[in-house]
Design a protein with these regions (language model features):
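Loop/turn-to-beta-strand initiation segments
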Residues: 71, 91-94, 137-142
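Short, conserved beta-strand edge motifs with alternating hydrophobic and charged residues
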Residues: 44, 74-76, 96-99, 143-144
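A basic- and aromatic-enriched beta-loop-alpha substructure that forms the phosphate/nucleotide-
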Residues: 78, 87-108
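SAM-dependent methyltransferases
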Residues: 1-9, 94, 125-129
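Conserved P-loop
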Residues: 2, 8, 12-89
Length: 195
């Protein structure tokens, strides 16, 4: 993955498609951080076990993380991301959030979501609170999210709305991060580096 692992930005947003290598890169950054004396790392997982496949995926990710980044604490927090960042961020602690896309999904379509419901309207306040926590975090942050706006325009109204909201969130986070990396085929492309 190269030279970008040699220095950790105070804040890094890692975007990419499914299986692009974004989570692996975040884990590599965490492992490099943990090699430093007195360093800690906390992984905030936002996935919820919606179905059997997701339960299996979460278990596989937990196992893989424990193997690749031993010593990193995992916190499962699908909704209260700002509070989790505030609680765990310290100068000696790297916080990895994986992923912003699932977190936004959780806000927009909570567990009690029904097919005829519209997108939840609680998300703007939650996103604003998260952005404040991101900017105020005393320790380094690595944020993982999906870039889903590169494909064809979706047919469904709610799917188009989600793509729009996620695109806006990604832009807001990218503005606040020192480094923004786009992952493709396991390779990092640096979009922004103000570190």
């Amino acid at each position: 993955m190269g030279s970008a692992l040699s220095s950790l930005a105070a804040t890094e947003l890692i975007l990419g498609g499914q299986k692009s290598g974004k989570s692996r890169r975040a884990e590599q950054l965490a492992a490099a951080w943990l090699a430093g004396a007195g360093h800690r790392a906390v992984f905030i997982a936002t996935a919820q076990p919606w179905d059997v496949e997701m339960v299996e995926r979460i278990a596989r990710h937990q196992s893989d993380r424990a193997e690749r980044v031993p010593g990193m604490l995992t916190v499962e927090e699908p909704l209260r991301l700002a509070e989790a960042i505030t609680q765990h961020s310290r100068a000696d602690t790297l916080v990895v959030v994986d992923c912003l896309t699932l977190w936004l999904t959780n806000l927009l379509m909570p567990a009690e979501f029904k097919e005829k419901s519209t997108l939840a309207h609680i998300w703007p306040a939650q996103v604003a609170t998260f952005l404040v926590a991101l900017s105020a975090a005393p320790g380094p942050l690595v944020l993982v999210g999906n870039e889903i706006g590169l494909g064809v325009i979706p047919m469904g109204r709610e799917v188009r709305a989600f793509v729009d909201v996620l695109g806006t969130l990604n832009q807001q986070v990218a503005q606040r991060c020192q480094r923004v990396t786009l992952m493709a085929a396991g390779l990092p492309l640096t979009l922004k580096d103000a570190a």
